[in-house]
């Protein structure tokens, strides 16, 4: 898990420095995350524990922007936390990220990097409404080790790469301590 965390740090640093550089390398790191950050099983109680982990990591990182955290398992919202200062706009972004992850079975950040590399957008390539789908960081597939997707983990409120990496770090910590 240490290696995936180190790669996550590299991903965040690189993207924050220049979001248009090394898009393929960044996409490959996200693919590694999506393959490594899988669960042997996941219960509703586990989702609560995962939500608490992200809450604690958010506090420890001392971010100043308010966020909304959302974990959906098998189509059922099992964890939702909105910080003071967040707004319904954050929930709208979560819905768009959720739709992207649910339909395309990959993180919304990965979708955004793919679209940037191809010089297109989701509406142009997949004929989906822009107001319903979002190709930006903060939506991550919850998958079992078998590869079956059972849910979606979303964060909205930070810069897109920070939303994405906060999710990855939270799952990595959960897997290290709980499974």
Swiss-Prot record:
SUPFAM superfamilies: GlcG-like. It comes from the Eukaryota. GO terms for biological process: endoplasmic reticulum membrane organization; post-translational protein targeting to endoplasmic reticulum membrane. InterPro entries: PduO/GlcC-like (IPR005624), PduO/GlcC-like_sf (IPR038084), YBR137W-like (IPR010371). GO terms for cellular component: cytosol; nucleus; TRC complex. Belongs to the UPF0303 family. This is UPF0303 protein P4H10.12. The lineage of its organism: Eukaryota, Fungi, Dikarya, Ascomycota, Taphrinomycotina.
């Amino acid at each position: 898990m240490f290696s995936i965390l180190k790669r996550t740090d590299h991903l965040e640093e690189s993207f924050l420095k220049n979001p248009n550089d090394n898009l393929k390398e960044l996409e490959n790191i996200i693919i590694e995350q999506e393959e490594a950050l899988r669960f042997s099983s996941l219960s509703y109680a586990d989702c609560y524990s995962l939500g608490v982990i992200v809450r604690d990591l958010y506090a420890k990182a001392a971010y100043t922007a308010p966020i909304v955290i959302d974990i959906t398992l098998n189509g059922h919202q099992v964890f939702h936390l909105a910080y003071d200062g967040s707004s319904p706009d954050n929930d709208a972004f979560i819905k768009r990220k959720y739709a992207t992850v649910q339909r395309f079975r990959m993180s919304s950040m990965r979708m955004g990097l793919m679209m940037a590399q191809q010089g297109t957008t989701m509406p142009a390539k997949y004929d989906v409404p822009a107001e319903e789908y979002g190709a930006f960081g903060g939506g991550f597939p919850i998958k079992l080790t078998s590869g079956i997707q059972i849910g979606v983990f979303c964060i909205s409120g930070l810069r897109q790469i920070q939303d994405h990496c906060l999710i990855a770090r939270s799952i990595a910590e959960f897997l290290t301590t709980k499974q």
